[in-house]
Amino acid sequence: MYDAYTPCEVALRLPVEVTCLAFQESNQTLLAGGRAGHLYAYTISANRRGFELTNICKSFHKKAVMELKVCQREDLLLCVSDGQLMAHKLSDPEYKVETLIHKVKPVQTFARFSPKTSGDLYVIVSSRKKLYLFKWGEKDGHKEFIEVALDYNPVFLDTPTSIRCVGEMVFFSVRNEYFSMTMQKDKTTTSPSEGSTPEGWNGFVTRLLNFNCQPGIVPMIDRRRVAFVRNEIVVTTDIWGQRPANVLSDEYKFSEVPMQIVYDSPYLVGMLSKGRVEVRSIFDGQLVQTMSLPKAMTLCSGARGQVFVAALSDIWILDTSQNLRKNVSHLIQERHFELAIQLAENSNLFAEEQKLEIKKKAALNLFNQKKFDESFALFGEIKTDISEVLSIIRMFPELLPDGFQSMTGVVSDMPANDRMRALLALGSYLSEIRTEHAKHIELYNRLYSSGAAKKTDEDEKAKLLLTLRVVDTTLLKCYIKTKPMLVDSLIRLQSNACTFEDAKKILESEGRLRSLFILYETRKKHEMALDLFIDQSSRPDADPFFDDAIQQIVEYLQSLGNSNLPLILKYAKWVLAKNLEAGVQIFTSDETEMARNLNRKAVVEFLKSECPDALIPYLEHVIFKWEEPSSYFHETLLEFYVARVNTLFKDYVHAFPDAFSDENITRAGDEDGELGLYRKRLLKFLEVSHSYSPQTVLLQLAPHAFYEERALILGRLKQHEQALAIYVNTLKNVPAAEEYCRLYYNAHDETNSQVYLMLFRTLVHPNQQQLHSIPYHADSTPFGSYRDDVSEASTLVNSTSSYQPDVNTAIKILAKHADKIDTVGALNMLPATTPLRVVFSAINAVIQTTGRQASTRKMEKSVSQCAMSKKLERKNKAQSTKIIVNFSSECVVCEKKIAVSAFVRYPDGRLAHLYCHNDSQGGNRN
């Protein structure tokens, strides 16, 4: 026990009996109501030694003042006297009556109700077994209490007493029971200022406790609890009226039933019989102080650390400030740190450093009591500079970073289970510290980027970085021991301040290779990360994380970007040797823009020298997927296509020597195996690409093979007759020739518009187009030297051979495509001996086509004439419109005079400057 409060006189031997007290905190004034209806005001003296009487209002009321309540913001003093609730003007020396509630009488008690959702003043009044709700507002031009509908259940058996409000909760007693009522504004109603529907509230009543004594309800706002007197025990609930799971955790037992209690953190002060006052701690309920004041019977809370006590004609103040320093020192010595901290926090007598020192001692005491969570929660309230953090971590010297372990500290020898709990609490504490420091560092970085940083900011940032380095390194070790699943998340943090060497050493010593890889990745140690993957991929006992090493390396390389191209090429060589397809994915990923933005020429040169087999799939992706237009890549792909086809063709000819004889020519792409596949791809590329040199490719292809390829290239050169001769005479494939014509026909091109006529000529006069334009020399072809076992007669196209005309097919072509062929020219090409019956079908088709074309032209002419006539009509109408422009004519856009400027006229007759009209039209388009 110790003397928490020192009693001092406020007023002694008053001529009236004191019935109630109220404290006005704004001017430190105590208001005392008397049985004779007088009101006394005592204000703290100028020298702050005692109180002095500053006002007496003998006309305050005619009868005893039973209850007082100060409403500072509204400048009201609420009072119950003679069963009526009245509102007096607080700032008036005579305390003039502002209003009174006539409707409710007699008033048993009342309480101020201040919902969080509203700034208005409400009062809840108890009278005749009911509760009433009134709102302070304006009515008929003056302020008064307006009744608000309050709907609640059940009906009370007696009049409620001892009402207290906390937020939207109302606590009260009826007979020997305590109740709570949850207040909720009726959403179907409005306040009078918002509409015609009157405001209303609903109350939901719940029974809490029963008791057999004088009721007492005390809100403990800072602890978010409410205390209820229940005989000699004071029990508490939360602010919603719910009891804690541990019923005994917040119960305070007085030596006898208190008649009245007040809460003055960290104490509960109870008024007992015979003027005895008992003070108990709210932390453990222990008795702190007992004092006796003659005939004391009324308590009232004052400023923090003050309680007023009234007897019949005497008033005292119980003050904690006089013995505060001595009491705090005593509590620290007795290890009652919670009380010491609360007293220091409530007072301005202690500097901030002193408060932090008390908290530090309290936290260490909790740690020694193995209350680790509470200990580190308190450490979290302490200013966390590097020295403070180190002093905490010294309790775990094995966690200190290198360079700090020489600092000595007392190591608690505790069981493994307790040490694990301590490490868990330490981890939570360090996590909060690192989050706070990272935010401050980010703030300093923003100051630097904006140019607003000062020299002191730079020093402060350096301290924060050092603290964060210690915290992160310790937290890494702590997580490894307690929460291994969080190690990787900690390493991935962008603000992680662990030095690379410290983190690497820690992870290697623990064998956490997966986490080590993440460290390499986040710190951009790319070579170390890739070397780790390659090394682990060959180990049978490696972590499952490294099982799919090739794919992991591919994804890693894909994320590096063009700035790391030499590194990508270095490790791509290893991937290509292991898996060609995976190696190509390094350079062709569509997941990010990294691969797309690589230097493509450098990649091509690398693949040429290191892995030519990967070049074709890479270039196909670049050209077809990424639509690369550069001729360099197109010609390189063609070069490798031709080289691959040449190699495959050599093997194919040796295996199937008769496949390319004059009697049995295998069509391009129909060959078995890779040759057919690559020839199809080559043909498609020759057809769709426009970024290569046809002459260069033509020289790479032998004249005795690759006929389809040569035909497509000749078409690109507009040498259609030679190309069609290949399809018709060599390949005997008229449908392919017809498809060729469809591909190249263009009615607006002088040469390409004649392609169908050229096909007709080739069919009618096949011997006029010989393949003599490109001489053939066996030793100059890409594969001429390796065909010694194949007869030249079976592969060469004989330049002197004769082809038979195919008039019937030509006539069919003419009939099918009569609209694309010069009919007269085609008919003139037919041999004179051609029977008329053969030509009839073609002539009939020509006539029908000509008729359709004539009808189409006639219809087009009619439509054009109709449109022209309408245009002329509109033109004539516009020209006949009279436009009057005078000196008063204004522009509808800028509202200036038209004068002699160029102008436009709108359909409704309005005028505008031409440039204003153009500007407005341009703005609308934008």
UniProtKB/Swiss-Prot annotation:
One Gene Ontology term of the biological-process aspect is: vacuole fusion, non-autophagic
State where it is primarily located: cytoplasm
Which InterPro entries did the record assign?
CNH_dom, Vam6/VPS39/TRAP1, VPS39/TGF_beta_rcpt-assoc_1, VPS39/TGFA1_Znf, WD40/YVTN_repeat-like_dom_sf, WD40_repeat_dom_sf
Q: Where is the CNH domain?
A: 15-306
State the deletion phenotype: In 1-cell to 20-cell stage embryos, there is defective autophagosome degradation with an accumulation of endosomes, lgg-1- and lgg-2-positive autophagosomes, amphisomes and paternal mitochondria close to the nuclei. Reduced number of gut granules in the adult intestine. RNAi-mediated knockdown results in a reduced number of gut granules in embryonic intestinal cells. RNAi-mediated knockdown results in the formation of large late endosomes/lysosomes, but with simultaneous expression of rab-5- and rab-7-positive vesicles on the basal side of gut cells.
Give a yes or no for keyword Hydrolase in this entry.
no
Q: Which domain of life is it from?
A: Eukaryota
Q: Which Pfam families match?
A: CNH, Vps39_1, zf-Vps39_C
What cellular component terms from Gene Ontology apply here? cytoplasm; HOPS complex; late endosome membrane; lysosomal membrane; membrane
Q: Provide the membrane topology annotation.
A: Peripheral membrane protein
Give UniProt keywords alphabetically.
Autophagy, Cytoplasm, Endosome, Lysosome, Membrane
| Record flagged with keyword Membrane | yes
Q: Where in the cell is it found?
A: Cytoplasm; Lysosome membrane; Late endosome membrane; Late endosome
Which residue intervals correspond to the CHCR repeats?
Answer: 590-768
PANTHER family per UniProt: CNH DOMAIN CONTAINING, VAM6_VPS39-LIKE PROTEIN
Please describe what this protein does: Plays a role in vesicle-mediated protein trafficking to lysosomal compartments including the endocytic membrane transport and autophagic pathways. Believed to act in part as a component of the putative HOPS endosomal tethering complex which is proposed to be involved in the rab-5-to-rab-7 endosome conversion probably implicating sand-1, and via binding SNAREs and SNARE complexes to mediate tethering and docking events during SNARE-mediated membrane fusion.
Q: Which family does it belong to?
A: Belongs to the VAM6/VPS39 family.
Q: What is the annotated quaternary arrangement, including any partners?
A: Probable core component of the homotypic fusion and vacuole protein sorting (HOPS) complex consisting of the core class C Vps proteins vps-11, vps-16, vps-18, and which further associates with vps-33.1, vps-39 and vps-41. May interact with lgg-2. Interacts with cuti-1.
Name it.
Answer: Vacuolar protein sorting-associated protein 39 homolog
Q: Which organism is it from?
A: Caenorhabditis elegans
